[in-house]
Amino acid sequence: MTHSHNLLGEPPATLLPGIPAADAALAAGTDPAEVAAAHPTASAAWAALAEGALDGGRTIEAYAYARTGYHRGLDALRRNGWKGYGPVPWSHEPNRGFLRCVTVLAQAAERIGETDEHDRCTQLLRDCDPSLAA
């Protein structure tokens, strides 16, 4: 017998805790490089660095920043119960740093011809939050 749906259902959404000091520093306009140095686990700081580099045409730099934030985010997700699948909603502010890193990683990968990585990142975004599929 074949079933076309998951009988166990979808796992609960993973909601990362914020990093208040890093979040406050970024909100106050502190240079994201300073924030990343002081709070290296803060994906939001890495996302800001990656976005700035990508906007400035520095694709390899953007790729490196985004990959760092992506890995820091994966570590945080796992520490908070994520098993490699399930919702990571954009609507929860502390999740956005990780999701922004995945977005920039996909864009930078596409620019350097890493089609497989672009596709994996795009699928991860869809899996984390279907509203990010566009």
Language model: regions and residue ranges:
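Start-of-helix signal in alpha-solenoid helical-repeat scaffolds, especially tetratricopeptide repeats
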Residues: 43, 92-95, 99
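Solvent-exposed loop and edge beta-strand segments that line ligand/cofactor-binding
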Residues: 34-37, 89-94
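N-terminal alpha-helical interaction modules that lie
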Residues: 1-84, 102, 107-134
